[in-house]
């Protein structure tokens, strides 16, 4: 009888093509997602070597990072570097026979939202993309992670990847989530607990009642930020919630094939007694709405708390780092989080740009107005999310409240397009990173849930969403 295996063990074992004595493995890759920033050199490498894309039907190209989200983007991309990258992806996809969603295609959007929408992402698969937030797809019980540009070329050419296996880590979130606390708060709390290096060398499996209670969109938010906790990837075992989400998707199995697939997917869970190298447990019932205060995703505190004092940190290097973060953020120890005013609000990204995120934000702002000191924007994660939101009338709620309603794309998550902060501007953001300059030169980012961001837009400062009226 074989030893109990984790979910990660099972997917890994199913995809090993060859293993060397030092543990280095050649893994088969089931799905490859491509965007315009990390792929040009990879395609050029194929072109110079005279190689085709080995499995174009297992590859999907989407433009997302550089595309403008302004309504007039149909007139073309003004930034020359961005335009060159977008044009290169369109040309490369055509030359190599890869399916491509341009900015004019309603299926276009952030690659990690598009994959699941299309049924391209399925349980038990290995999925890669030249983007760190590929971990998002782990919400389906798929082994998904980012790769570098040279690896993008290797996968395009061979449909395989050279890897060494990571260790297993289990994060259990037990109990029921309180009202006002979301998947975003869970994952920020996890990162606050383990730190940004806590998952280094591991693949994290998320489990527990609170995780099981989440929708697929909430689970994608959790797995999306696994990389911010240092992990190679994040996984959630598939269940009926997963199967229902997949049914009817354009590229998902249908009919009898789907039933056969579901029978297999039901085996994708960690066995009783499977070994985890590290286990972390959180109590969902004690979690509050969370706001980041510094320049690292581990710098988090309850919305009812205060900016911490770095002098309380024993480690000298870490203490100096946190003082630097406070200086960059323009904050002082002891400042109440609810006293921090914001200049900008960004609701979107591959972390929180899905329809449920927009519904949560709309519920908060309906019948209210954005504070006169705040510039707020809503960026749907894909054209299909935008279409659904407009069918539900959410765009009218946002526009009437004073939000800017945009076209889909990565937008202000990162300063690679026209949406960015000005120096010194402070933003309540539903994205995943609050590094120095992430949203623009000297911009200050606070990571929050969609409901918290929406409330900050109305109030002009952070508020406890649990007391929102």
Swiss-Prot record:
NCBIfam families: leuC, PRK05478.1, PRK12466.1. It comes from the Bacteria. GO terms for biological process: L-leucine biosynthetic process. The gene is leuC. The keyword Iron-sulfur applies. GO terms for molecular function: 3-isopropylmalate dehydratase activity; 4 iron, 4 sulfur cluster binding; metal ion binding. Pathway: Amino-acid biosynthesis; L-leucine biosynthesis; L-leucine from 3-methyl-2-oxobutanoate: step 2/4. [4Fe-4S] cluster binds at residues 350, 410, 413. It holds the Pfam family Aconitase. This is 3-isopropylmalate dehydratase large subunit. Disulfide bonds: none annotated. Belongs to the aconitase/IPM isomerase family. LeuC type 1 subfamily. Binds 1 [4Fe-4S] cluster per subunit. Transmembrane segments: none annotated. It catalyses: (2R,3S)-3-isopropylmalate = (2S)-2-isopropylmalate. The keyword Transcription regulation does not apply. Keywords: 4Fe-4S, Amino-acid biosynthesis, Branched-chain amino acid biosynthesis, Iron, Iron-sulfur, Leucine biosynthesis, Lyase, Metal-binding. Its cofactor is [4Fe-4S] cluster. Heterodimer of LeuC and LeuD. Its EC number is 4.2.1.33.
């Amino acid at each position: 009888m074989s030893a109990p295996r984790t979910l990660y063990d099972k997917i890994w074992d199913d995809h090993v093509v060859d293993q060397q004595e030092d543990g280095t493995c050649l893994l088969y890759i089931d799905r490859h997602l491509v965007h315009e920033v990390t792929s040009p050199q990879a395609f050029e490498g194929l072109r110079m070597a005279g190689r085709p894309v080995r499995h174009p039907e297992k590859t999907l190209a989407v433009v997302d990072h550089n595309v403008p989200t302004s309504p007039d983007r149909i007139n073309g991309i003004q930034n020359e570097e961005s335009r060159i990258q977008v044009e290169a992806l369109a040309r490369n996809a055509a030359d190599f026979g890869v399916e491509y969603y341009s900015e004019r295609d309603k299926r276009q959007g952030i690659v990690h939202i598009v994959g699941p929408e299309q049924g391209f992402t399925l349980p038990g698969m290995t999925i890669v993309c030249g983007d760190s937030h590929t971990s998002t797809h782990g919400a389906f019980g798929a082994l998904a992670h980012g790769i570098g540009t040279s690896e993008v070329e290797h996968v395009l050419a061979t449909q395989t990847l050279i890897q060494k296996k990571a260790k297993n880590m289990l994060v259990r979130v037990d109990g029921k989530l309180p009202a006002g606390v979301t998947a975003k708060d869970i994952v920020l709390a996890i990162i606050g607990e383990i730190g940004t290096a806590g998952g280094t060398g591991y693949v994290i499996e998320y489990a527990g009642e609170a995780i099981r209670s989440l929708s697929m969109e909430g689970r994608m938010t959790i797995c999306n930020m696994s990389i911010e906790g240092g992990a190679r990837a994040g996984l959630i075992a598939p269940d009926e919630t997963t199967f229902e989400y997949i049914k009817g998707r354009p590229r998902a199995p249908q009919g009898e094939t789907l039933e056969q697939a579901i029978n297999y997917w039901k085996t994708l869970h960690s066995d009783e007694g499977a070994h985890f190298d590290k286990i972390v447990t959180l109590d969902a019932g004690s979690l509050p709405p969370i706001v980041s205060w510094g320049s690292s995703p581990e710098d988090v505190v309850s919305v009812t708390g205060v900016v911490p004092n770095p002098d309380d940190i024993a480690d000298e290097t870490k203490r100096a780092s946190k003082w630097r973060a406070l200086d960059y953020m323009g904050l002082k120890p002891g400042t109440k989080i609810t006293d921090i005013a914001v200049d900008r609000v960004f609701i979107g990204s591959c972390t929180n740009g899905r329809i449920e995120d927009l519904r949560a934000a709309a519920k908060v702002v309906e019948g209210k107005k954005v504070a006169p000191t705040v510039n707020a924007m809503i960026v749907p994660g894909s054209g299909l999310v935008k279409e659904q939101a407009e069918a539900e009338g959410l765009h009218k709620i946002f526009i009437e409240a004073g939000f800017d309603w945009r076209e889909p794309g990565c937008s202000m998550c990162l300063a690679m397009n026209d949406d960015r902060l000005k120096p010194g501007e402070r933003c309540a953001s539903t994205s995943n990173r609050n590094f120095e300059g992430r949203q623009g030169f000297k911009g200050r980012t606070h990571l929050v849930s969609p409901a918290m961001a929406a409330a900050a837009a109305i109030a002009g400062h952070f508020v406890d969403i649990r007391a929102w009226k």
